[in-house]
């Protein structure tokens, strides 16, 4: 599975920049254009994959949850991603419905777990994170180019309106120029300190294609680590 296909499943955007011209690779591009291109990406096909969420708490206790992740096209400009815990008994379901040019629509079952800022399956990955809510904020600025994991990236800074109460005060994303994938991101709290740190891990090359085996989110405040592992 390519990076682009994998990121579709996890962060709803198929490499985050599907169809973004490579002409963007040279100059420092406009941040709003970059964010819009990410938000408007649509997967080319339906995708179903088995996964597991492994949470390592501060006390070293580990919690593992089996998941099914499905991305389904609803039209040319709309799709839905569903995350389901396994087994079916006491199953929890999270859904993100996305349409080009519109805000995301979220749903959870049971409904008492409908807070999009609460971690999925007890992890540090929230539904808002998977929905890339920070890319809908009004301030989007590309601040520099920087290498991350030996890859040249555009660093995108996203900030919310000051009058809106958000969990994060800003987010820095490292967007790989070649694949168009967000390969790392720092989430800052209201005091300007790094609250969470995301990174793509487990990159392997199979049959000439890059395959992503794992995503990691570290909660620096809680001292926990969440790993989303893909079972191909």
Language-model features and meaning:
Residues 1-10:
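Bacterial N-terminal signal peptides that target proteins for export
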Residues 15-62, 70-76:
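N-terminal leader/targeting segments and the immediate start of mature chains
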Residues 69-72, 141-147, 201-203:
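Short amphipathic beta-strand and strand-loop transition segments with alternating hydrophobic
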Residues 128-129, 151-232:
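Gly/Pro-enriched, hydrophobic low-complexity segments
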Residues 26-34, 40-46, 61, 89, ...:
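Flexible, processing/modification-adjacent segments and terminal tails
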Residues 47, 51-53, 67, 81-83, ...:
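One face of beta-strands
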Residues 67-108:
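Mid-chain, structured segments of secreted extracytoplasmic proteins
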Residues 51-56, 86, 157-161, 218:
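Generic short beta-strand segments
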């Amino acid at each position: 599975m390519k990076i682009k296909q994998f990121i579709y499943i996890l962060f709803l955007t198929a490499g985050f920049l599907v169809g973004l011209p490579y002409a963007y690779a040279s100059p420092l591009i406009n941040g709003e254009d970059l964010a819009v291109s990410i938000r408007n990406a649509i997967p080319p096909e339906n995708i179903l994959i088995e996964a597991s969420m492994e949470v390592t708490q501060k006390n070293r206790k580990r919690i593992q949850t089996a998941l099914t992740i499905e991305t389904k096209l609803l039209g040319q400009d709309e799709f839905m991603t569903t995350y389901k815990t396994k087994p079916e008994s006491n199953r929890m379901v999270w859904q993100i419905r996305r349409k080009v040019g519109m805000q995301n629509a979220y749903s959870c079952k049971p409904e008492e777990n409908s807070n999009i800022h609460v971690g999925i399956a007890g992890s540090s990955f929230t539904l808002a994170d998977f929905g890339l809510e920070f890319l809908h904020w009004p301030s989007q600025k590309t601040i520099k180019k920087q290498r991350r994991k030996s890859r040249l990236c555009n660093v995108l800074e996203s900030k919310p309106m000051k009058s809106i109460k958000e969990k994060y005060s800003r987010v820095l994303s490292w967007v790989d120029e070649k694949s168009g994938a967000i390969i790392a991101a720092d989430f800052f709290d209201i005091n300007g300190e790094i609250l969470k740190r995301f990174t793509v891990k487990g990159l392997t090359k199979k049959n000439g294609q890059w395959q992503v085996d794992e995503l990691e989110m570290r909660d620096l405040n809680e001292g926990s680590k969440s790993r989303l592992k893909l079972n191909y």
